[in-house]
Amino acid sequence: MSVSTHLYAPEGMGRRPAAFLRLVFAIMLAVTVASARAVNAPPLPQRVIELAPNLKVQGGGELTFFGISVYDGYYWSPARGWAQDGPFALDLHYHRALDGAKIAERSVGEITRLGYGTAEQRSRWGDEMKRVFPDVRRGDRITGVNLPGGVVRYFLNGNSIGDIADPGFARAFFGIWLDPKSSQLDFRQLLLGEKP
């Protein structure tokens, strides 16, 4: 007795079941990889833990630009969601070298697109970011920590590199990734743990 099995593709797929199954498998693998990133987030630097000891990773993922990997990001918070006034951290692990001034300029562009602040405030925030943001190399890690009172403290590879103290700036800066109108909605969902 012989048993024969056939794979049938959905209506309209013709005779391409193997291609269909490969596509389904690739999608499942991509979702698994994205989920694993959040679970396997590297621990926060010790100095960050000392500032905000109750943070837990909520999600994470990879940000790409036209298919080029820019960085892996992780969102750390005591609870789910974006608690704008509470302590939280955004931890970025860079895959490529980037100029600190260009990072600041891109950030101002995103803040402007989101509608935060006045032109004068955005200009001041841009100057502050240029003062604090270093050039990054592949493998560098920048962690931004939102502290009570609207202070954002930045760390490069675990070492403090500067603060920007302005509640409006804190909301605007973290809004680049966490605002519901972010230009990177898929990445936002990964950071907040809303997308597996």
Question: Residue locations for each model-derived region?
Answer:
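N-terminal secretory signal peptides that target proteins for export/translocation
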Residues: 1-19
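Bacterial N-terminal signal peptides
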Residues: 22-32
